[in-house]
């Protein structure tokens, strides 16, 4: 029996930017894609739809931003709302995945590789964070 290739797309949702990454479940490979602007937590749905149609993922993962103690915060509710909107728009399974420490890890990874080019406003931290979320999800769901 031939397994269907599972393409998974992950989002690091923010009120100003949304990082996107793509991955493949069988090989476990991941790749950060791009960062889309978000105005007051409202995503650019046309761009998300375009990326969705290009990659045709089988599943979506949205980072779940919890406080360090595991409690929810305002951005947690906005991320959950974003996940529900993705489900309704694309008629696809969306899972939430704990994203604590991903931004810190993304900054560390970026700085290690590109320390001479590090500029806080121009770094792809959000898409790297989305890739970390996806890698974590793949590791827990292999």
Swiss-Prot record:
This protein's GO CC annotations: cytosol
Gene Ontology MF terms: nuclease activity
NCBIfam families, sorted: RNAse_H_YqgF (TIGR00250)
Gene3D superfamilies, A to Z: YqgF/RNase H-like domain
Domain of life: Bacteria
Biological process (GO), any one: rRNA 5'-end processing
Record keywords, A-Z: Cytoplasm, Hydrolase, Nuclease, Ribosome biogenesis
Protein name: Putative pre-16S rRNA nuclease
SUPFAM superfamilies hit by this protein: Ribonuclease H-like
Enzyme class: hydrolase
CDD domains: YqgF
Record gene name: yqgF
PANTHER family registered for this protein in UniProt: POLYNUCLEOTIDYL TRANSFERASE, RIBONUCLEASE H-LIKE SUPERFAMILY PROTEIN
Stored HAMAP family: Nuclease_YqgF
Protein family: Belongs to the YqgF nuclease family.
Stated role: Could be a nuclease involved in processing of the 5'-end of pre-16S rRNA.
Compartment list: Cytoplasm
EC code: 3.1.-.-
């Amino acid at each position: 029996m031939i397994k269907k290739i599972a393409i998974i797309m992950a989002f690091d949702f923010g009120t100003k930017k949304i990082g996107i990454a793509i991955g493949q479940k069988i090989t476990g490979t991941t790749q950060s894609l791009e960062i889309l602007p978000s105005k007051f937590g409202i995503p650019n749905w046309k761009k998300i739809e375009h990326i969705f149609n290009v990659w045709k993922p089988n599943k979506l993962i949205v980072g779940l931003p919890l406080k360090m103690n595991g409690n929810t915060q305002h951005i947690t509710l906005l991320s959950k709302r974003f996940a529900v909107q993705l489900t309704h728009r694309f008629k696809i399974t969306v899972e939430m995945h704990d994203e604590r420490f991903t931004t810190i890890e993304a900054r560390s990874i970026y700085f290690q590789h590109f320390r001479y080019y590090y500029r806080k406003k121009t770094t792809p931290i959000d898409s790297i964070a989305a890739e970390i979320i996806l890698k974590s999800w793949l590791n827990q769901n292999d």
